[in-house]
């Protein structure tokens, strides 16, 4: 079955599309990536989405206008990737505007026991009409309804797509947020261990916001990590950041721009104010690597497995300074781009949502309670047919 996957991440750069063929057993499918395409968001739309996602009050009419624009760009990406409409199904994540993980009962907080919720902006019926095929969307809702985090959703798909090796294998996505998947080995005492996954913390969110500010709006990201590469990391400040509650908490956990956004950047840049722009960006870049390395060290310290390799995808893998920091801090782990194994770094998540849509069609669960904390595994997504 041919399925088209669409993904627009936390960085709100635009829409990535992946056309794939799936067949065989859902848990271990045979697959081929047939085509990929990207359509960027216009800069004005990107800015409006980011401001709203960081809590800026927005008129209802403007929300409607943005959701129409986002949906139309999703449809444009679908057409560019599959102009002959060979796919019979479309899986679309939508644009995350707010993600609110659940708060366990018993926590010393006024929000103790609060259920989780998440909003992915999309007009699914319009997308089904514009693309001329059924759309599977709202993938997080069922997991959240079962008490889960609703994220990350990629680990089970990662395990199905990449398969197993002799040791633990890690897949790290460096989008706006850094999320990691750990796949158990194909033999040995850990072979029955469940797949693991969680959100480590910020990847590109803080770096991109900082670059926009430091460049006076001329640059929205640090190309190849060039400016950060000229700076020196403020290790003392970095170590303080790593002691913040989110980074000391254990999975299941998920996060987003609502936590690591403009307000968070303002606080961190105030602490780095005496330092040069290059040093500030170097420290933020190292921070994105350090949150991953700290999580892996904690696994080892508690007797959990450490991956023998870490395959990196997402826009952050094009940041050479960030990749160097990962290799430096993830000691004993081979760090390399996922493209080394023919999984395009930019389109991994689009491929994942194509697979999740296929799983929905097959009635196969897409989440994992060990990862999200949901009460049970369940089929993800809602289906909308063309009118």
Curated annotation (Swiss-Prot):
Xref: SUPFAM superfamilies: Actin-like ATPase domain (SSF53067)
Lineage: Bacteria, Bacillati, Cyanobacteriota, Cyanophyceae, Synechococcales
ATP-binding listed as a keyword: yes
Gene from which the chain derives: anmK
Family label: Belongs to the anhydro-N-acetylmuramic acid kinase family.
Source organism, top-level taxon: Bacteria
Xref: InterPro entries: Anhydro_N_Ac-Mur_kinase, ATPase_NBD
Cystine pairs: none
Binding annotation for ATP: 9-16
Protein name (record): Anhydro-N-acetylmuramic acid kinase
Organism, as annotated: Synechococcus sp. (strain WH7803)
The keyword Nucleotide-binding is assigned to this record: yes
């Amino acid at each position: 079955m041919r399925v088209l996957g669409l993904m627009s991440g936390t960085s709100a750069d635009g829409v990535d599309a992946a056309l794939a063929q799936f067949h065989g057993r859902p848990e271990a499918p045979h697959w081929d990536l047939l085509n990929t395409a990207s359509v960027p968001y216009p800069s004005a739309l990107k800015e409006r989405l980011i401001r709203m996602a960081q809590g800026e009050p927005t008129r209802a009419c403007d929300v409607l206008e943005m959701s129409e624009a986002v949906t139309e760009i999703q449809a444009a990406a679908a057409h560019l990737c599959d102009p002959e409409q060979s796919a019979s199904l479309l899986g679309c994540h939508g644009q995350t505007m707010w993600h609110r993980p659940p708060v366990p009962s018993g926590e010393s907080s006024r929000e103790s026991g609060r259920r989780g919720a998440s909003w992915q902006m999309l007009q699914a019926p319009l997308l089904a009409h514009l693309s001329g095929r059924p759309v599977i969307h709202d993938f997080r809702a069922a997991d959240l309804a079962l008490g889960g985090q609703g994220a990350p959703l990629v680990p089970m798909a990662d395990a199905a797509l990449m398969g197993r090796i002799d040791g633990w294998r890690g897949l790290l996505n460096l989008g706006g947020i850094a999320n990691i998947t750990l796949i158990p080995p194909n033999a040995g005492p850990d072979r029955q261990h469940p797949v693991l996954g969680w959100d480590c913390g910020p990847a590109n969110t803080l770096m991109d916001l900082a670059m926009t500010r430091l460049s006076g709006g001329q640059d929205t990201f640090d190309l190849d990590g060039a400016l950060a590469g000229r700076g020196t990391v403020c290790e003392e400040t970095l170590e303080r950041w790593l002691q913040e509650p989110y980074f000391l908490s254990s999975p299941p956990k998920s996060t987003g721009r609502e936590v690591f956004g403009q307000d968070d950047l303002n606080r961190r840049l105030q602490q780095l104010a005496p330092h040069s722009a290059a040093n500030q960006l170097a420290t933020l870049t190292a921070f994105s690597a350090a949150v991953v390395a700290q999580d892996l060290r904690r696994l080892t310290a508690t007797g959990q497995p450490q991956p023998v390799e870490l395959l990196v995808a997402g826009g952050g893998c094009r940041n050479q300074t960030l990749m160097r920091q990962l290799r430096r801090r993830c000691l004993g782990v081979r760090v390399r781009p996922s493209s080394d194994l023919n999984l395009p770094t930019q389109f991994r998540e689009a491929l994942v949502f194509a697979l999740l849509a296929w799983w929905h069609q097959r009635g196969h669960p897409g989440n994992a309670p060990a990862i999200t904390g949901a009460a049970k595994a369940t089929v993800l997504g809602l289906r909308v047919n063309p009118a």
